[in-house]
């Protein structure tokens, strides 16, 4: 067996794990997993993420708005429409305000999953504004960010260079030599 594993990016709160979530999570310590950072991608899954974080002492949470959450409801796939569109009408700033109380929870250790994803047909200006707001929030809260960078490396890099937040880049679609 290798050394201990800390999974820096998980979505066990996703519906894909409904059938076996508890059994799977219960088994992780026996497989060498010493920690998991469970990601909320919008206000709709934040309560489920925190429920897991409070159930398991080795699970912590990251709370944020994923750029894909800005997709129109018809494009959201099996998870259904994100509250960013279905509840807040695309007003991510209002959703960020609704998320603020979660950051007081000691199990919330990061802002994320946040970033840019130019694969999906989400307006670039909205993504940039949201990501910049989440970076500034992370700096204000003195928390790291969990960055999603899909086909948007130049813009992600520019914002990270401008603000220099602590964090992890989890989805990275750039060429190796540019990393």
Which residues fall in each region the model found?
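Short active-site oxyanion
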Residues: 33-36, 142-145, 165-168
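Nucleotide and nucleotide-moiety/phosphate-recognizing core
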Residues: 137-139, 156-161
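Histidine-centered catalytic micro-motifs
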Residues: 5-14, 146-152, 168-173
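Metal-associated gating/positioning segment near the N- to mid-region
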Residues: 11-48
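Active-site gating/metal-coordination segments in enzymes
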Residues: 1-19, 48-144
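Conserved small/polar residues in nucleotide/adenosyl-binding loops
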Residues: 177-178
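A cross-family glycoside hydrolase active-site/sugar-binding cleft signature
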Residues: 39, 62-64, 112, 146-148, ...
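Active-site-proximal loop/turn and secondary-structure-junction residues that shape catalytic pockets
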Residues: 42, 65-69, 115-117, 151-153, ...
């Amino acid at each position: 067996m290798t050394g201990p594993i800390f999974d820096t990016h998980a979505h066990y709160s996703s519906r894909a794990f409904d059938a076996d979530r508890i059994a799977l999570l219960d088994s992780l310590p026996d497989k060498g997993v010493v920690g998991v950072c469970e990601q909320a991608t919008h206000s709709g899954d934040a309560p489920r993420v925190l429920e897991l974080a409070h159930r398991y002492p080795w699970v912590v949470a990251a709370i944020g708005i994923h750029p894909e959450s800005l997709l129109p409801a018809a494009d959201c796939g099996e998870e259904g429409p994100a509250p960013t569109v279905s509840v807040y009408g695309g007003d991510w700033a209002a959703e960020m305000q609704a998320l603020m109380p979660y950051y007081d929870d000691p199990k919330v250790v990061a802002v994320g999953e946040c970033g840019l994803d130019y694969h999906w047909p989400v307006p670039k200006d909205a993504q940039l504004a949201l990501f910049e707001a989440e970076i500034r929030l992370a700096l204000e809260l003195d928390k790291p960010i969990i960055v999603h960078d899909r086909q948007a490396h130049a813009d992600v890099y520019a914002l990270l260079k401008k603000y220099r937040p602590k964090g992890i880049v989890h989805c990275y679609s750039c060429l190796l030599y540019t990393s």
